[in-house]
């Protein structure tokens, strides 16, 4: 990892008036030029992290570093960090130009330089020709672009975005996801984005921190978070999941619904109770006799790109299936899946425990160098 631009070291926050602890020993390093997302439900602590980073709140304990320098006591205006708030915080009595140029005027930048940089920045956010437009006459998407332009015109090291897309309609929100991601990559500025929207986080991020009750419960790439949730909370919070109680018989063999199935997971105790995750899109509908499981269709909804089918097995477990095939309510269908479609979770495992287990298991499972060399020599002799 390169030198981090932002570091949180055992950062906690308790509001003294209520005694409520909203952050518990937060630790992370953020690299320069990446798109990070703090993802969690309301009250999870994600916006508190953003406010501490910006200097709007003080940490109760722990240390915050910017480029290796401790900034706990550094004033907001001395931090090379800019924030885009949920309500955009624009000046309604000013024009687009005046809003974007505001910070430069405070720094007493030359007027010609201000005009040049405002023009360049508005071009970046696709607002060329809007310089003299009143803020009150702009659409929600246009106001957001103005707020982003104002945040990036000084070319800060870090831009913080506190749920800036939440007030937009679905189509515009999707368009702005593409625009924000493309802008961040073009500028090479570190973006820290706060949202409760899982799809938004998966679509835009290089790295996601999943938060719950003031703690980071899992961090990783969007693919890691979606395909390898470490516990019930993450699996249930990120996308749709079928979560079934099971038993890990041995490495690569799991039992649930009274049957044994091959898997690609290992490193657990023999006969350890586990939870099995299968995503709805990984279930294939078959004839009942051809499926690994049989379920009875209860209800279905048409979601546009697929049907969302709810079915129940003979043990009463609910199954969600995403399929392009329309089902018939009351019919019995088969469900098929591959070993790769099963993700096995230990009960209540933390991210630290998960990482340690995987590291230990991989080391135990790797062949020794001497054995690898012997195999290669044997193959070479056979080819002579």
Curated annotation (Swiss-Prot):
It is found in: Cell membrane. Part of the ABC transporter complex PotABCD involved in spermidine/putrescine import. Responsible for energy coupling to the transport system. SMART domains: AAA. Its main location: membrane. InterPro entries: AAA+_ATPase, ABC_SmlMolc_Importer, ABC_transporter-like_ATP-bd, ABC_transporter-like_CS, Mo/tungstate-bd_C_term_dom, P-loop_NTPase, PotA-like, Transp-assoc_OB_typ2. It comes from the Bacteria. Transmembrane segments: none annotated. It catalyses: ATP + H2O + polyamine-[polyamine-binding protein]Side 1 = ADP + phosphate + polyamineSide 2 + [polyamine-binding protein]Side 1. Keywords: ATP-binding, Cell membrane, Membrane, Nucleotide-binding, Translocase, Transport. ATP binds at residues 40-47. GO terms for cellular component: ATP-binding cassette (ABC) transporter complex. The lineage of its organism: Bacteria, Bacillati, Bacillota, Bacilli, Lactobacillales. This is Spermidine/putrescine import ATP-binding protein PotA. Belongs to the ABC transporter superfamily. Spermidine/putrescine importer (TC 3.A.1.11.1) family. Residues 6-238 form the ABC transporter domain. It comes from Streptococcus pyogenes serotype M1. It holds the Pfam family TOBE_2. It is an enzyme of class 7 (translocase). Its EC number is 7.6.2.11. GO terms for molecular function: ABC-type polyamine transporter activity; ATP binding; ATP hydrolysis activity.
């Amino acid at each position: 990892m390169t030198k981090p631009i932002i570091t949180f070291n055992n950062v906690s926050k308790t509001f003294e008036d209520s005694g409520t602890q909203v952050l518990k020993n937060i630790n992370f390093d953020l690299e320069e030029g990446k798109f990070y997302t703090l993802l969690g439900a309301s009250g999870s602590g994600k916006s508190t992290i953003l406010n501490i980073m910006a200097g709007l709140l003080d940490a109760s304990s722990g240390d915050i570093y910017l480029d290796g320098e401790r900034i706990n006591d550094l004033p907001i205006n001395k931090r090379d960090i800019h924030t885009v708030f949920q309500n955009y915080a624009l000046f309604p009595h000013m024009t687009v130009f005046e809003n974007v140029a505001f910070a430069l005027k405070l720094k007493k930048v030359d007027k010609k330089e201000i005009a040049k940089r405002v023009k360049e920045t508005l071009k970046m956010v696709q607002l060329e020709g809007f310089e003299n437009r009143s803020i009150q006459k702009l659409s929600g998407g246009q106001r957001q672009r103005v707020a982003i332009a104002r945040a990036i015109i000084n070319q800060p090291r870090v831009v913080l975005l506190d749920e800036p897309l939440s007030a937009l309609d679905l189509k515009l929100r999707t368009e702005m996801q593409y625009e924000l991601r493309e802008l961040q990559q073009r500028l090479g500025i570190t973006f820290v984005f706060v949202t409760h929207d899982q799809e938004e986080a998966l679509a835009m991020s290089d790295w996601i921190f999943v938060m719950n009750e003031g703690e980071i419960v899992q961090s990783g790439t969007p693919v890691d978070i979606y395909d390898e949730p470490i516990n019930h909370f993450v699996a249930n919070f990120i996308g749709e999941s079928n979560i079934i109680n099971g038993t890990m018989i041995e490495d690569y063999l799991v039992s649930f619904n009274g049957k044994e199935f091959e898997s690609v997971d290992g490193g657990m105790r023999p006969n350890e109770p586990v939870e099995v995750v299968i995503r709805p899109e990984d279930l294939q509908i078959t004839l009942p006799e051809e499926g690994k499981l049989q379920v009875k269709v209860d209800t279905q909804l048409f979601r546009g790109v697929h049907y969302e089918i709810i079915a129940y097995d003979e043990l009463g477990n609910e199954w969600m299936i995403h399929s392009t095939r329309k089902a018939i309510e009351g019919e019995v269908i088969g469900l098929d899946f591959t070993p790769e479609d099963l993700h096995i979770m230990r009960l209540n495992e933390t991210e630290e425990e998960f990482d340690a287990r995987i590291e230990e298991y991989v080391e135990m499972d790797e062949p020794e160098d001497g054995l690898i060399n012997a195999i290669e020599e044997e193959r070479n002799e056979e080819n002579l």
